[in-house]
């Protein structure tokens, strides 16, 4: 039997987070507009500024669950495009989105994604991946940077010459080094902190445009 969680059972910090979440205008907007998560508005702002995703494109969405970015990508690419989504967590099906559940850190998942693509060139890789946090920044930060590096490595393997890359990364230890990897890999780099990113959050999104070479 499921146990209902009441305010009395939550810690003080959890209650504060819950209040903030429920009062969040982007949470309310997502519920009203039918998006699965407030994160939708981060990608929507990026898309509005840079028009990265276009009809007919092939998109790979890493760290996709619960699926708000895939919702947007699917609508933008239309019936002639392809969206492949992957996450370690389960995700409810979406029209015209192919979903692969698995841990992207495992080579098997990496290879399965390549098999699904079957040699098809990808136009854009988008990654909202983040590890489960421990609360210890010295542990969490390297884990997140590692996921970013895996996403970049994958992008290098599947993107065409004009390919694009959008990745969430936390500022902190390893950020400058990873940013340089993206600079070395794309003709243009943009750094964006969308309005939907909470002010206290260290997250930013790096946007690479025009793949120029593989990582050395």
Swiss-Prot record:
Q: What SUPFAM superfamilies does the record tag this protein with?
A: S-adenosyl-L-methionine-dependent methyltransferases (SSF53335)
Sorted alphabetically, the Gene Ontology cellular component annotations on this record are:
cytoplasm
Keyword Ribosomal protein in the entry? The reply is no
User: Per UniProt, which keywords does this protein have?
Assistant: Cytoplasm, Methyltransferase, rRNA processing, S-adenosyl-L-methionine, Transferase
Q: What is its EC number?
A: 2.1.1.166
Q: Which GO terms describe its molecular function?
A: rRNA (uridine-2'-O-)-methyltransferase activity
Please name the catalytic residues of this protein: 168 (proton acceptor)
Q: Where is it localised?
A: Cytoplasm
Uppermost EC category: transferase
The UniProt annotation places S-adenosyl-L-methionine binding at: 67, 69, 87, 103, 128
* Pfam families the record matches: FtsJ
Reactions the enzyme catalyzes: uridine(2552) in 23S rRNA + S-adenosyl-L-methionine = 2'-O-methyluridine(2552) in 23S rRNA + S-adenosyl-L-homocysteine + H(+)
Q: Which family does it belong to?
A: Belongs to the class I-like SAM-binding methyltransferase superfamily. RNA methyltransferase RlmE family.
Q: Which NCBIfam families does the entry link to?
A: PRK11188.1
Protein name (database record): Ribosomal RNA large subunit methyltransferase E
Q: Which organism is it from?
A: Acinetobacter baylyi (strain ATCC 33305 / BD413 / ADP1)
Q: Which gene encodes it?
A: rlmE
């Amino acid at each position: 039997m499921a146990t209902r969680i009441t305010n009395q059972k939550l810690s003080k910090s959890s209650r504060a987070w819950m209040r903030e979440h429920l009062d969040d205008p982007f949470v309310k907007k997502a519920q009203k507009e039918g998006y699965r998560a407030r994160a939708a508005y981060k990608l929507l702002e990026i898309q509005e500024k840079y028009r990265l995703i276009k009809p007919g494109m092939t998109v790979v969405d890493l760290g996709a669950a619960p699926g708000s970015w895939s919702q947007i990508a699917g609508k933008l690419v239309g019936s002639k495009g392809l969206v492949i989504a992957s996450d370690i967590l389960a995700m409810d099906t979406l029209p015209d989105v192919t979903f692969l559940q698995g841990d992207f850190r495992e080579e098997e998942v990496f290879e399965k994604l390549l098999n699904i693509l079957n040699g098809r060139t990808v136009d854009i890789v988008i990654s909202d991946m983040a590890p489960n946090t421990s609360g210890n920044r010295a542990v969490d930060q390297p884990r997140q940077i590692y996921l970013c590096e895996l996403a970049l490595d994958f992008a290098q393997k599947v993107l065409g010459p004009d390919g694009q890359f959008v990745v969430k990364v936390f500022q902190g230890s390893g950020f400058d080094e990873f940013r340089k990897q993206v600079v070395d890999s794309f003709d243009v780099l943009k750094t964006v902190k969308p309005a939907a990113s909470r002010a206290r959050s260290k997250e930013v999104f790096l946007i690479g445009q025009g793949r120029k070479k593989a990582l050395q």
